[in-house]
From Swiss-Prot:
It is found in: Cytoplasm. This protein is essential for positively regulating the expression of transfer genes that are involved in the conjugal transfer of DNA between bacterial cells. One of its GO terms (biological process) is regulation of DNA-templated transcription. It comes from the Bacteria. This is Protein TraJ. GO terms for cellular component: cytoplasm. InterPro entries: Sig_transdc_resp-reg_C-effctor, TraJ, WH-like_DNA-bd_sf. GO terms for molecular function: DNA binding. Keywords: Activator, Conjugation, Cytoplasm, Plasmid, Transcription, Transcription regulation. Its main location: cytoplasm. The keyword Transcription applies.
Length: 229
């Protein structure tokens, strides 16, 4: 029974990952959707339906009607699947429904298969941050964990930067290159970060931070680190 128990446990974790991600983006304050490797839309949140779809139109038909965007997003998805340096890609200034959007495309490993998360942000808000009053609330428990990590003598002063980059889906190879540290240092810090947040891997960490409504702050920090290196 033990091998079967392991298979059942692995299958349950895969279901939990997809269910948790679906539950999180359902209440997300931006249009968002999940696709599988075949291009099938597994889930679209309410704002995605309200922003892009008509009552009798499927997400697949809507995407095919957006010819330029369809080609661009397909290429971006392939990059998210294949690029060893990062599993997060941004598509900027896409014009849909009379608005410009910046779209984050992020891959998650669900068992042996990848799923892709799209999130749509108002491009004007992303581009003109100074004039955008973004309400970012960082919960006390997140602040306390970040503070404790910073004070941990077993890691370097780069631990917070590793946290912000790692939590947005960026690989250890890319983190090492951006921060000019070794890959082993990045992995060591990531392991400690997961321990502090009581998760076992990157996907669980990202979903936890989505659930904490921490993602806006996280992306801003990560982009700031990348742009200043």
């Amino acid at each position: 029974m033990y091998p079967m128990d392991r298979i059942q446990q692995k299958h349950a974790r895969q279901i939990d990952l997809l269910e948790n991600l679906t539950a999180v983006i359902q209440d997300y304050p931006n249009p968002a959707c999940i696709r599988d490797e075949t291009g099938k839309f597994i889930f679209c949140n309410t704002l995605f339906h309200e922003s892009f779809l008509t009552q009798d139109q499927s997400a697949e038909k809507w995407l095919l009607s957006q010819r330029d965007f369809c080609e661009l997003i397909s290429v971006t998805e392939m990059e998210a699947y294949r690029n060893e340096h990062t599993h997060l890609n941004l598509v900027e200034d896409v014009f849909i429904q009379n608005r410009f959007w910046t779209i984050s495309v992020q891959s998650f490993l669900n068992g042996h298969r990848n799923i892709i998360l799209w999130q749509f942000y108002d491009a004007a808000h992303v581009r003109h941050k100074d004039s955008y009053n973004q309400k970012t609330i960082v919960s006390d428990d997140i602040r306390n964990i970040i503070r404790r990590m910073s004070d941990d003598s077993s890691v370097s002063s780069y631990v917070n930067d590793v946290f912000y980059l790692y939590s947005t889906g960026i690989s250890h190879n890319a983190i090492a290159r951006i921060l000019n540290i070794s890959i082993s240092t990045s992995k060591k810090h990531a392991s400690l970060i997961c321990d502090y947040f009581s998760v076992s891997n990157k996907d669980e960490l990202i979903i936890l931070l989505y659930n904490k409504k921490f993602i806006y702050y996280l992306y801003e920090k990560a982009m700031c680190i990348i742009n200043t290196r």
